[in-house]
């Protein structure tokens, strides 16, 4: 699975605050556009929430967000999105071009 920044989460780019959570939402909305989204259920988590991977035009939205630098591979649950994260990190794409807290660290600090 993946994790994404919280809507209120900000990052720092060259000393300026950037709304990285809002940007993550925007690039996902832009990617989906008016296309149909197909989700494949992968079961439930410990809190009984549905886990699913969603696709638009046969492209994984999870992979897209991670490769765009606005999603992070949940390494303890899956290795699937690590190559996408490595690509974004190596190329300093999205949040990897900024100073940021991982979403799980951001939530813990709230």
Where does each model-flagged region fall?
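Electropositive
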Residues: 1-70
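Short, polar/flexible loop-turn hinges at active-site or ligand-entry regions and domain interfaces
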Residues: 72-76
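N-terminal targeting pre-sequences for secretion and organelle import
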Residues: 77-110
